[in-house]
Amino acid sequence: MTTTIIYTGQLRCSATHNQSGTVIETDAPTDNRGKGERFSPTDLLCVSLGTCIITTMGIRAIDMGINLDGTTLQVQKHMLGDPRRVGGIDITLGFPASLQLEEKDRLILQRIGDNCPVQKSIHPDIKTNIVYNWGAVTA
């Protein structure tokens, strides 16, 4: 993966995914002199963990003949200071009530999520709390 990042001023950046041309913009958070109108770089760290968890689970789910469509994730970032950094990430996954899985299949998928590449790349000082709520999402 190659990306091109341009600092556009006023604590904002524009990042282009070179293969697809997709662009995302970042902004500093309001508590650090930004406008808070876009994801902050530390927000993207947390979003990356959440999307990696569900993407890797989705890959295995396809192989297992399981459809995870409609699964939701709530991500909460906890910042620490001195030095300013992410101290914790809470992620709660809500799976559709219509998804009826055996316990062994749930455990397989949870193990995949708990060991996704982003999770394995995060420094151990960052505390992650991942909760899997099976059957939590209703139509």
Spans of features found by a protein language model:
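Extended beta-strand/beta-hairpin segments
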Residues: 1-47, 55-139
